[in-house]
Amino acid sequence: MKAAEIREKFLKFFESKGHTIVRSSSLVPGNDPTLMFTNSGMVQFKDVFLGTDRRPYTRATTAQRSVRAGGKHNDLENVGYTARHHTFFEMLGNFSFGDYFKHDAIRFAWELLTTVYMLPKDKLWVTVYQEDDEAYDIWAKEVGVPTERIIRIGDNKGARYASDNFWTMGDTGPCGPCTEIFYDHGPEVWGGPPGSPEEDGDRYIEIWNLVFMQFNRDAQGNMTRLPKPCVDTGMGLERLAAVLQHVHSNYEIDLFQNLIKAAARVTEVSDLNNNSLKVIADHIRACAFLIVDGVIPGNEGRGYVLRRIVRRAIRHGYKLGRKGAFFHKLVADLVAEMGAAYPELKEAEQRVTDVLRQEEERFFETIEHGMSILESALADLEAKGGKVLDGELAFKLHDTYGFPLDLTADVCRERGVTVDEPAFDDAMARQREQARAAGKFKAAQGLEYTGAKTTFHGYEEIAFDDAKVVALYVDGSAVTEVKAGQDAVVVLDHTPFYAESGGQVGDQGVLANASTRFAVADTLKVQADVIGHHGTLEQGTLKVGDVLRAEIDAQRRARTQRNHSATHLMHKALREVLGSHVQQKGSLVDADKTRFDFAHNAPLTDDEIRRVEQIVNDEILANAPGIVRVMPYDEAVKGGAMALFGEKYGDEVRVLDLGFSRELCGGTHVSRTGDIGLFKIVMEGGVAAGIRRVEAITGDNAVRYVQELDARVNEAAAALKAQPAELTQRIAQVQDQVKSLEKELAALKSKLASSQGDELAQQAVEVGGVHVLAATLDGADAKTLRETVDKLKDKLKSAAIVLAAVEGGKVSLIAGVTAEASKKVKAGELVNFVAQQVGGKGGGRPDMAQAGGTEPANLPAALAGVKGWVEARL
């Protein structure tokens, strides 16, 4: 039974038992930013189990795409070397949300395994929690499993309820016993039953885990029964397929065998048992599906995990002799295997291929040099009998050549060497500290402040009348007063000034009273809730305790707000036009523009840019209100607010609904979308592999831009004697005319060259039976020079010729040597002789070569020396 059929039978079986088939959720958990990747079937139902979400069904079944390759769930180093470790796997599961419980869950599992999949009953063993008499009795008395094949597992992990057969969601919350089903491969395979000293052998393989959530554990460890207990089960598709296909390694199942054969094809390797092929076959699944779900290779978070997996696959291809990109070629094979079950993979095939190819090409630029350094270091280490690689070297490979630490550790492990990881960590920490020190911004960074928090009024007000000075800083040190002309940082107890945060620049404005005026050039955070006003005291003396009117530059704030609100609309529009993989990677919002970096692997087309602009401007015309609400983080995310992975959020967050956009945001925004006025994209480009940048303008800036563009169009139309609407047609006509004139000019040059050729032939000097000619051909281009040389070679029969032309301060050179003469005089050497004297170089075939130079003043002397140079070689 093939893996695809096993998956299909599982889902159909539970559908027949009243379960709703729920499609696999994304590998990027939408409801849990603390989790790197979806690693089990229950992740998408976590809020249902916690009671904070309700679904229109009480029974569900899924085939969930899962990844374990980061954080605590990290199987990366074992992948390819063991029978059952994978970065990507499919978890088959059935779930009950307060509907059925142990009796039905156990009966369903037994029926599916023994009736649908036809597994022999006498091959199945089960474990239950030591105290779960109910599950034990169901297996023994209702299902009929012999008691000698039912094993009770107690608290075997050193604490109460710490057991292989007791599941917990965390320190508190839903928990309960579980029962596991094992398949016995028979006595010919080493290993003992669960709970025995030999349980780590391969004879008894766990295939299904049924979790019974029946308790809630509080902070004191007290257990209370849940009013509606739930069921969460998980069975690895790959493990089940290995059992049903009578093989002992997951890599021997049909799905993996097909991918291993594809990996062998693209790496040109014949040994299908090579572990590197297993690594590559496993990694293409994880990489492809992560990219499908919007993850792009990068240097942090999920993007870095993806980069590590890609580069590990590339390293194994390199180990097999591949010196160029190969990994991306497996995407089509993966689509053939899994595209029917997961249509999103087929839809994203080209994007996945492009992202992987770009990442490969980038790494292949450095892998050879990096591997050479690593191999040399390992050879030196082995010669000295050492077993630990210097952590500083591992960091150099990481920092300079893009080698993730686990890739270096992988190579070392194959040679029986470990990496000094503490030294690596120290080097990494030093670099981060240097970066942090270099990134300290102006005077507000690193100030020692122990006072009260600043109360921010800037969401509602542009001025605050009774702001009290609570701290002053000059050159990073606290002072009690500031004199006119000094730069300083002012901390107030209340302020309307927005401090730079979330990509939005800080406010500018004025702090003043009757005798004092302080010009604020920038506003930034001294601490999380303490705002510093950086600027210059223009008048008077400013002291701690003074009371000031704090007023922002309202016009600058308004322009900044327009750009910030437009950024939210643009983010949403980009996701609609390009796909849900678009994720913000950085932004800068100021009064002039918005700059937005996002994950996408290809330049935006003109049509895509127009569609984004149209969507945003439609939202502006709708004049929808901006609605701000403060709510618990979990509630905001559950309500669809976009949270950025890697951002730190408090328990309470600010949610902005603006038109069709909903995001978590602490910035300042327009009251209605119509306040943005007009939105125009003015730049699109790439900033890194898989990262694009868009710059856009709004409001009066956008109006001026369009007006200036219109003026330039009118000027161009006038110059071409056409109406603006006819400009494209008129330009096409002019281009046709230019092409026609260029053809005429080329014909004239050819004709001129032909006529000059006759004259030049008469200037040739015979040296040892070879006609030598070195001359300048005025007004000739490279093509004309070549044609003239060819004609002279035909005319002179035995010749060595150099022709030159000068245009725009640059020298063009062509050398031609006839077949007989080229036995002694090479055109490439001849042209280089002249080129070196005019500040250039060149090369070519023995009979024809070309060169260029930048010193035309030296050309006459260089040509004059050709005769002697040829004569010396005859």
Swiss-Prot record:
Q: Please state the Enzyme Commission number of this protein.
A: 6.1.1.7
Q: Name one GO molecular function term.
A: tRNA binding
InterPro entries recorded: aa-tRNA-synth_II/BPL/LPL, Ala-tRNA-lgiase_IIc, Ala-tRNA-ligase_IIc_anticod-bd, Ala-tRNA-synth_IIc_core, Ala-tRNA-synth_IIc_N, Ala-tRNA_ligase, Ala_tRNA_ligase_euk/bac, DHHA1_dom
What's the record's note on cofactor binding?
Binds 1 zinc ion per subunit.
For this UniProt record, the keywords arranged alphabetically read as follows: Aminoacyl-tRNA synthetase, ATP-binding, Cytoplasm, Ligase, Metal-binding, Nucleotide-binding, Protein biosynthesis, RNA-binding, tRNA-binding, Zinc
Q: Which reaction does it catalyse?
A: tRNA(Ala) + L-alanine + ATP = L-alanyl-tRNA(Ala) + AMP + diphosphate
Cofactors (names): Zn(2+)
- Can you supply one Gene Ontology CC term for this chain's record? cytosol
- Which Pfam family, an example, fits this chain? DHHA1
Provide the binding site for Zn(2+). 564, 568, 665, 669
The subcellular location is: Cytoplasm
**Source species, domain of life:** Bacteria
Q: What is its main location?
A: cytoplasm
One GO term under biological process is: alanyl-tRNA aminoacylation
Record comment regarding domains:
Consists of three domains; the N-terminal catalytic domain, the editing domain and the C-terminal C-Ala domain. The editing domain removes incorrectly charged amino acids, while the C-Ala domain, along with tRNA(Ala), serves as a bridge to cooperatively bring together the editing and aminoacylation centers thus stimulating deacylation of misacylated tRNAs.
What does the protein in this record do? Answer: Catalyzes the attachment of alanine to tRNA(Ala) in a two-step reaction: alanine is first activated by ATP to form Ala-AMP and then transferred to the acceptor end of tRNA(Ala). Also edits incorrectly charged Ser-tRNA(Ala) and Gly-tRNA(Ala) via its editing domain.
Family that this chain belongs to = Belongs to the class-II aminoacyl-tRNA synthetase family.
Q: Which PANTHER family match?
A: ALANINE--TRNA LIGASE, CYTOPLASMIC, ALANYL-TRNA SYNTHETASE
Which protein, by its recorded name, is this? Alanine--tRNA ligase
Source organism lineage? Bacteria, Pseudomonadati, Pseudomonadota, Betaproteobacteria, Burkholderiales
